[in-house]
Amino acid sequence: MSEVVTSAANPVVKRMRMLASRKIRQREGVSLAEGIQPVWQAVEAGAPVEALIFAPDLLRYQPAVEMVLEAERRGVRVVRLSGELFQRLSDRDGAAGLAAIVGQRLTPLRELPAEPGTTFVALHEIASPGNLGTVIRTADAAGARAVILVGATADPYDPAAIKASMGAIFSVPVARAAGSDEFFAWADERDLAVVTTSARAEQSVWEARYPDPLVVLMGSEGPGLPDADLRRGRLQVSIPMTGTAESLNLAVATGVVLYEVVRQRRARGQD
């Protein structure tokens, strides 16, 4: 068993701090996941774990302790930190005492298969890592095949995105499209129907009949999708607002559309 690290000068501790930088994450192709659920998901999904970091005096959840020890027996590097040092490094109050340095895995867009019954989620220039992570978690829950990031989008491996995804980032394939032209060319080549949301749409999310296979394209909460992208989509739907709110959070809106797609497919006996 390795000794407990107490010094901030330790190379692993320095590396954890450096991974707060998007530039360094992208250069080295690794990210930092913190928390029991994200780390557990990374290990279960077979993500390339460079190191597991845990504080023996903070990590109280015994199944997680056993998972760490089992990974160590399999040859995964395990670094033990003092609780005080882990707390100083943590971005959250009441740190659970578990983190991991994990390799990033982006799937080339051309490798995503579009089979019958497939649903994708595409996000156009989403700036918030938290929103991005929550949508990835929602896509995972609704059975989407992959999430496609279109244009200048937040880093899916930002610690805030990993945290919001609850580790789904390690299970759901994520691909990038440089811009709308590349995205629509990919969708057209695979005969994927692009579904968008707009308050001006003639059909509500419940009235529309969804094509198969499809990709749900969502814009950022502020400006939404560019008009040109709305026009290029095959189907526009609205999400009726019956209260005083004018709009929904991005992840909630995405979930409403995805689960209506799931409901209709099940009603048709496709799932």
Which residues are covered by each model-predicted region?
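N-terminal positively charged helical leader segments and presequences
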Residues: 1-91
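Glycine- and other small-residue-rich loops at beta-strand/loop junctions that grip anionic moieties
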Residues: 5, 31, 124-125, 150-151, ...
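Glycine/charged-rich beta-loop-alpha catalytic/anionic-binding loops adjacent to active sites
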Residues: 22-23, 113-121, 232-241
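RNA substrate-binding interface of SAM-dependent RNA methyltransferases
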Residues: 37, 44, 70-73, 79, ...
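Structured adenosyl-cofactor binding patch, chiefly the S-adenosyl-L-methionine
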Residues: 100, 138-142, 156-169, 227-271
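Active-site/ligand-binding-proximal alpha/beta "capping" segment
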Residues: 195-245, 249
